[in-house]
């Protein structure tokens, strides 16, 4: 398992939380605009993401990155303004068999 973020503080929290839960998790600082480390390790069995589309550039970068990672993709999105752009791209150019949209309130 590899947990990533671009913020150094988040990387430290990822490592600390894994240790507190008795888990071994590799952590890495990764920028989606420089995805080579993730792509070299592909294909991934499962890609999990939560609240990733908080900036317009994230939607574009993720849309370019995710097809190269392989495996299943599960994203949790709270309804950010840029999520529609991201979803529209994958409805036009699917990266998998299914896209489900679930609303949790």
Feature-to-residue mapping (PLM):
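S-adenosylmethionine-dependent methyltransferases
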Residues: 1-105
